[in-house]
From Swiss-Prot:
Pfam families: ACCA. Residues 36-286 form the CoA carboxyltransferase C-terminal domain. Acetyl-CoA carboxylase is a heterohexamer composed of biotin carboxyl carrier protein (AccB), biotin carboxylase (AccC) and two subunits each of ACCase subunit alpha (AccA) and ACCase subunit beta (AccD). InterPro entries: Acetyl_CoA_COase_a_su (IPR001095), ClpP/crotonase-like_dom_sf (IPR029045), COA_CT_C (IPR011763). Its main location: cytoplasm. It comes from the Bacteria. The gene is accA. Its EC number is 2.1.3.15. GO terms for cellular component: acetyl-CoA carboxylase complex. Component of the acetyl coenzyme A carboxylase (ACC) complex. First, biotin carboxylase catalyzes the carboxylation of biotin on its carrier protein (BCCP) and then the CO(2) group is transferred by the carboxyltransferase to acetyl-CoA to form malonyl-CoA. Disulfide bonds: none annotated. It comes from Campylobacter lari (strain RM2100 / D67 / ATCC BAA-1060). This is Acetyl-coenzyme A carboxylase carboxyl transferase subunit alpha. The keyword Lipid biosynthesis applies. It catalyses: N(6)-carboxybiotinyl-L-lysyl-[protein] + acetyl-CoA = N(6)-biotinyl-L-lysyl-[protein] + malonyl-CoA. The lineage of its organism: Bacteria, Pseudomonadati, Campylobacterota, Epsilonproteobacteria, Campylobacterales.
Length: 311
């Protein structure tokens, strides 16, 4: 059953009326309602606020990492474990082919349904998840295979066990190692990009965001609680923090914005997945002109420009 956000109520009503008309076999009503649905969808999605985009980034029907992997990879083979502690299911790693090209995909997976969400810790990786990601990325470097990172997490898991096993060290190690990785790397924020938990697999030659995704150093609710002692002011915090793809592109913090279907990725997964796949293939083709040492040097130059300012 489809889930609807508060600003999608009119769309929900038309969807329900359309479903009833189809059941009754009322072709005339179906035509009218389909036109109404298209108009209402354009009206709602044409001028989304930052907070509404945040809601879309968290939408439960939005395609997750495994949805993209299963759709774009052929001959996919999953790679497990960090070879030190355990296999963290919040991070998934696959080797396969995209458009006939070898690729390794590393993604954060939130899970669907109660059991799967608990199994994957709601997409909040433990340190062993980040170590698994780094192990697989280093494997890709060894065989000169491009790496695609799919970022989608509310943040790294802040539990006691995770801290005892070196959560901050694991994130820092990934930032250090991925910055100098000698192979093509592409990172795409497909939903939530939550702070260090996202950065740990977000260092790449190309950093892109899906149109309705977000990337921030803290959740808007957390920001509102700290600054105003009022989590209910999260809408104002979202706007002030500039967390959307368009804002981050304007600030030069990401390279590209991947367009989503008018109604959002959650209502048209097939085209959203196609857009991401097309972007990845184009990015690989563009980056193949550089040798691996040039890639690492250019990536480092880009990183050192972040945060630079002049008065």
């Amino acid at each position: 059953m489809a889930s609807y956000l508060d600003f999608e109520k009119n769309i929900q009503q038309i969807d329900e009326d359309l479903a009833n008309a189809k059941i009754k076999g009322d072709d005339e009503a179906v035509k009218i309602l389909e036109k109404n649905l298209e108009k209402e969808t354009q009206k709602v999605y044409k001028n989304l606020s930052d907070y509404q985009r945040l809601q879309l980034a968290r939408h439960p029907d939005r395609p997750y990492a495994l949805d993209y992997i299963q759709a774009i990879l052929s001959d996919a083979y999953e790679i497990h474990g960090d070879r030190a502690f355990r296999d963290d299911p919040a991070i998934v790693c696959y080797a396969g082919y995209i458009g006939g090209k070898k690729i390794i995909v590393i993604g954060e997976q939130k899970g669907r349904g109660t059991k799967d969400k608990l199994h994957r810790n709601f997409g909040m990786p433990h340190p062993e998840g980040y170590r698994k990601a780094l192990r697989v990325a280093k494997m890709a470097e060894k065989f000169n295979i491009p790496v695609l990172f799919l970022v989608d997490t509310p943040g790294a898991y802040p539990g006691v066990g995770a801290e005892e096993r070196g959560q901050s060290e694991a994130i820092a190690r990934n930032l250090y190692e991925l910055s100098a990785l000698k192979t093509i790397t592409i990172a795409v924020v497909i939903g939530e990009g939550g702070s260090g938990g996202a950065l740990a697999i977000g260092v790449a030659d190309k950093l892109a965001m899906m149109k309705n995704s977000v990337f921030s150093v803290i959740s808007p609710e957390g920001c509102a609680a700290i600054l105003w002692n009022d989590p209910s002011k999260s809408e104002a915090a979202t706007k002030a923090m500039k967390v959307t793809a368009d804002d981050l592109k304007t600030q030069g913090l990401i390279d590209d914005v991947i367009e989503e279907p008018m109604s959002g990725a959650h209502r048209d997964k097939e085209n959203a997945i196609k857009n991401l796949s097309d972007y990845v293939l184009k990015a690989i083709e563009e980056l193949e002109q550089y040798d691996k040492r040039e890639l690492a040097a250019l990536r480092m130059q880009k990183i050192f420009k972040f945060g630079a300012f002049a008065e």
